[in-house]
């Protein structure tokens, strides 16, 4: 059996990924499929941390007429809903999981403590980071880059609704070309919509590679872990 390339990874899931084809809310079948994909790599001994977005319920920047700080905090609460849903799906298939939130809510999750998170990973528990960084004006992409640096993840697995990074929007331009490899500077200079510039810069500064791939295709998380050439590889 092929060996995984990585020992510890951070998986970034957008809120939209949890909504499935519905585009809003939570799709149980989609969440269960993601949980089974995660179980495939934990069974190989890979330590998995997850950052979830909240765009299937709310995006802070879309709160028209609303105070930006308030809107961002609402988005953080949406990520907690998603984290609990994913935790439930994982634990239903007997994957020990802990949710840690950047804003304390001890009745439902642990507060984020880096040492505790690392200890959970060492015990082969999945750790889900929710509520972003706990601060407004920072995206969940930036949270993923920050947490990956803090827990010393070897790679960020950026699961998207498209199968990689394209030179233009493939939903608009049928001739859009998928890019197999990019540097962080390519992403920043070309304005490619991978992560926001803060998150990309943080990955560049800490030399954390990023694998961008489609989540819709079955077993793609496992394929990336085993080194199959899918999606887009971003590196220094």
From Swiss-Prot:
Kinase in keyword set: yes
Gene Ontology terms, MF aspect: ATP binding; UMP kinase activity
E.C. no: 2.7.4.22
Keyword terms: Allosteric enzyme, ATP-binding, Cytoplasm, Kinase, Nucleotide-binding, Pyrimidine biosynthesis, Transferase
Superkingdom classification of source: Bacteria
Binding-site list for UMP: 54, 72, 133-140
Region (Involved in allosteric activation by GTP) location: 20-25
Reactions catalysed, as given in the entry: UMP + ATP = UDP + ADP
Pathway: Pyrimidine metabolism; CTP biosynthesis via de novo pathway; UDP from UMP (UMPK route): step 1/1
Major place of residence: cytoplasm
SUPFAM superfamilies from the UniProt entry: Carbamate kinase-like
The keyword Nucleotide-binding is assigned to this record: yes
Annotated compartments: Cytoplasm
Entry binding sites for ATP: 12-15, 55, 59, 161, 166, 169
GO biological process: 'de novo' CTP biosynthetic process; UDP biosynthetic process
Activity regulation, per record: Allosterically activated by GTP. Inhibited by UTP.
One Gene Ontology CC term in the entry: cytoplasm
Function comment: Catalyzes the reversible phosphorylation of UMP to UDP.
Family classification: Belongs to the UMP kinase family.
Subunit relationships: Homohexamer.
Name listed for the protein in its UniProt record: Uridylate kinase
Protein source organism: Alkaliphilus metalliredigens (strain QYMF)
């Amino acid at each position: 059996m092929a060996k995984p390339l990585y020992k510890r990874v951070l998986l970034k899931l957008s809120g939209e990924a949890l909504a499935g084809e519905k585009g809003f809310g939570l799709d149980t079948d989609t969440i269960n499929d993601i949980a089974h994909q995660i179980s495939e790599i934990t069974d190989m001994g890979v330590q998995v941390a997850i950052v979830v977005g909240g765009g299937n319920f709310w995006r802070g920047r879309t709160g028209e007429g609303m105070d930006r700080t308030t809107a961002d905090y609402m988005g953080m609460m949406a990520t907690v809903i998603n984290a609990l849903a994913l935790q439930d799906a994982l634990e239903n298939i007997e994957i020990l999981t802990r949710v840690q939130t950047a804003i304390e809510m001890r009745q439902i999750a642990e507060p984020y403590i880096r040492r505790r998170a690392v200890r959970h990973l060492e015990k082969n528990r999945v750790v889900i980071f929710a509520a972003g960084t706990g601060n407004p004006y920072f995206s969940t992409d930036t949270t993923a880059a920050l947490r990956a640096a803090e827990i010393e993840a070897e790679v960020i697995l950026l699961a998207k609704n498209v199968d990689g990074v394209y030179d233009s929007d493939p939903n608009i331009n049928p001739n859009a070309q998928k890019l197999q490899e990019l540097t962080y500077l390519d992403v920043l200079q070309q304005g490619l919509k991978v992560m926001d510039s803060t998150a990309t810069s943080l990955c560049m500064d800490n030399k954390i590679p990023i694998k961008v791939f489609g989540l819709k295709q079955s077993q793609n998380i496992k394929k990336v872990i085993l080194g199959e050439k899918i999606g887009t590889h971003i590196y220094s």
